[in-house]
């Protein structure tokens, strides 16, 4: 039987790798683009026809005419934020209602989830994990404890269900001694978002996706955040509340592992992280500041300043392993265009002096061991072929490929979709 394939696109670092742009480059090859986890805490930034967009919940394939986009069961959805995002796209002339399907099994982020998020974070004192405050963690907590509200719930007796969940949350918030909140206005907008959601096609997305595959069509699964924020395999507890790795696509969309084809792993030519948590190659000097300025490293949703550092190949090798990456995509190579010297971490030195190339359970106190490369000192942003790459950049690419035992198939040399080199 001639069935379609499911390819997965995901970040290999701590998020913000540039997944949105790459999805936009890859989407012409696929019939359906599906988001499989996460919520509005992660923003995909794309530039399309000279205009910048930040997508928080809607799959990046929405800019491609004729493509079906699916928000899968693994996603947590905030109706008010979704409504704002969707209406902004509609104002720009993008048709959503006929091409965007939403899983009935996706969980809803309630206004009280956001208050709970703030209350729980405040109660941690110095041990805060750096939440975005969007209510993601408490929503996934309700999901796992089997007490959450789902998109499908809005179709029948919703108000009673909502009030029961709200009352439960308010008790939890009171028990934490948190009083600094008023959800009146937010709740009003949230309910408007619920009515707006009803205008979209709510589906059993796992059934729809498998029908698409049986008809011979191909699907691109889009992850949010990055591998190192995975709740199981990331730098716990400084992680998100969902599985961001390739296996999460099967769970978050309802497809069998045998349906997975290519796994595209996205990495920056350097590395960034937002919020607290270990970051072995972080730079605290003027080099880190230069990377931040040249790369415009500020959160798409929060505006938070990102921590910047050199590329960590030990961490990336781990990410390639747990995801089964078949092809690498290197983003923001142009940010390093003006550096005299470029470094990449090739090993960790542990507290006892041992040197290892394994990414371990505890990376708080490791010291990075670097390999230095001569910078290419060339503006690559106007290049149209890999043949134009300077030798120094070719050497850097070759070393990364050799270390990770995986080919780099696509290289981004600027923010625009046209500034993308697909290698031979």
Protein language model annotation of sequence segments:
Residues 1-424:
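Non-transmembrane, aqueous-exposed alpha-helical and coiled segments at domain scale
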């Amino acid at each position: 039987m001639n069935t379609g394939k499911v390819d997965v696109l995901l970040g290999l670092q701590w998020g913000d790798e540039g997944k949105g742009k790459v999805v936009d480059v890859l989407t012409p090859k696929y019939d359906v683009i599906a988001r499989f986890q996460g919520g509005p805490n992660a923003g995909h930034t794309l530039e399309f026809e000279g205009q910048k967009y930040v997508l928080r919940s809607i799959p990046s394939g929405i800019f491609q005419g004729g493509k079906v986009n699916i928000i899968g069961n693994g996603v947590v959805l905030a109706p008010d934020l979704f409504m704002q995002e969707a209406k902004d796209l509609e104002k720009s002339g993008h048709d959503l209602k006929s091409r965007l399907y939403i899983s009935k099994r996706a969980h809803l982020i309630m206004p009280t989830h956001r208050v709970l998020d703030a209350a729980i974070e405040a109660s941690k004192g110095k041990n805060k994990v750096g939440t975005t405050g969007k209510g993601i963690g408490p929503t996934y907590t309700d999901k796992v404890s089997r007490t959450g509200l789902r998109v499908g719930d809005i179709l029948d007796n919703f108000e009673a269900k909502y009030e029961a969940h709200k009352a439960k949350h308010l008790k939890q918030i009171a028990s934490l001694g948190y009083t600094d909140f008023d959800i009146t206005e937010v709740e009003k907008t949230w309910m408007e978002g619920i009515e707006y959601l009803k205008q979209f096609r709510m589906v059993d997305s796992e059934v729809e996706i498998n029908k698409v595959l049986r008809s011979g069509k191909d699907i691109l699964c889009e992850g949010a955040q990055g591998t190192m924020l995975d709740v199981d395999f990331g730098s716990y507890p400084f992680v998100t509340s969902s599985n961001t790795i390739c296996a999460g696509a099967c769970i978050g969309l309802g497809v069998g592992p045998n349906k997975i084809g290519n796994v595209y792993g996205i990495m920056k030519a350097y590395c960034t992280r937002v919020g607290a948590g270990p970051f072995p190659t972080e730079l605290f000097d003027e080099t880190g500041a230069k990377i931040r300025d040249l790369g415009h490293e500020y959160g798409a949703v929060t505006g938070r300043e990102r921590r910047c550092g050199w590329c960590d190949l030990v961490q990336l090798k781990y990410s390639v392993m747990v995801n089964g990456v078949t092809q690498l995509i290197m983003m923001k190579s142009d940010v390093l265009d003006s550096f005299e010297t470029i470094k990449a971490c090739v090993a960790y030195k542990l507290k006892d002096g041992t040197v290892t190339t394994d990414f371990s359970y505890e990376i708080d106190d490791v010291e990075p061991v670097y390999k230095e490369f001569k910078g290419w000192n060339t503006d690559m942003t106007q290049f149209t072929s890999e043949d134009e790459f300077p030798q120094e950049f070719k050497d850097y690419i070759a070393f990364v490929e050799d270390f990770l035992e995986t080919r780099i198939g696509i290289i981004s040399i600027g923010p625009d979709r046209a500034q993308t080199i697909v290698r031979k």
